[in-house]
Regions:
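Intrinsically disordered or low-complexity boundary/linker segments at protein termini
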Residues: 2-51, 161-180
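Small/aliphatic-rich secondary-structure junction motif
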Residues: 35-83, 166-169
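A short acidic, amphipathic alpha-helical/loop segment
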Residues: 52-55, 122-126, 152
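Acidic, proline/glycine-rich short linear motifs
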Residues: 70-93, 174-180
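Structural beta-alpha unit
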Residues: 106-134
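Glycine-rich, Arg-bearing micro-motifs that act as flexible, cationic patches
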Residues: 139-155
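Protein-protein interaction modules outside structured cores
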Residues: 157-159
Length: 180
């Protein structure tokens, strides 16, 4: 009997969480002056890609942009359940620091944070405090992107009431261009 009660509670909790995730998150951007834009960037391994930097620069041209870069701390399911997220958070922080330095080198001021391992939850957490005007969501190309396989871009567009620009960053092609 106790096993049934525990399993029932877990199923109910998962159902409630799934229902909550289905509703679009209404964000309240902070009022800002004409010519200002708040850009939320969500990227993991692609956070340092040239294509993403170019998109951020393009979206912030001609305006005073406030940019928040969030790098989800992706972890293996086993490490997640064992509450062992230190390595994942440290790796995400390293990628984030390198990306912020690259953005600064091309004249873009941004701040960053390591987010939840679930990119949708990382977006929601950031939107609750940042109030973005738009989201730039960066992934690997199709066939190499776990986020595309899981439908993260489509789910984000359904879930959040903020315009989303999807940027595909092919890090291998960018490295070949540098070597070539």
């Amino acid at each position: 009997m106790p096993v049934f009660a525990v399993l029932s509670a877990i199923v109910f909790w998962m159902w409630v969480r799934a229902r909550r995730a289905e509703r679009p998150l209404k964000t309240r951007p902070r009022p800002h002056a004409e010519g200002e834009r708040r850009i939320l960037v969500i990227a993991n391994e692609t956070v340092g890609g040239r294509t993403l930097r170019e998109m951020i620069r393009e979206r912030s041209e001609g305006v005073r942009a406030e940019i928040l870069v969030v790098t989800p701390a992706l972890n293996s399911p086993l490490r997640h359940w064992a509450s062992d997220e230190d390595d994942a958070r440290a790796a995400a922080q390293d990628r984030l620091d390198a990306s912020l330095a690259r953005l600064a080198s091309v004249g873009l001021r941004a701040r960053g944070e390591v987010g939840d391992g679930d990119p949708l939850q990382a977006m929601e957490d950031a939107l609750r405090t940042f109030g973005a005007d738009e989201i730039i969501l960066s992934t690997h190309p199709e066939g190499r992107s776990h986020w595309l396989e899981r439908g993260v871009v489509a789910k984000a567009r359904e879930r959040f009431a903020v315009p989303i620009t999807h940027v595909v960053v092919d890090l291998e092609a960018e490295q070949e261009e540098v070597r070539g």
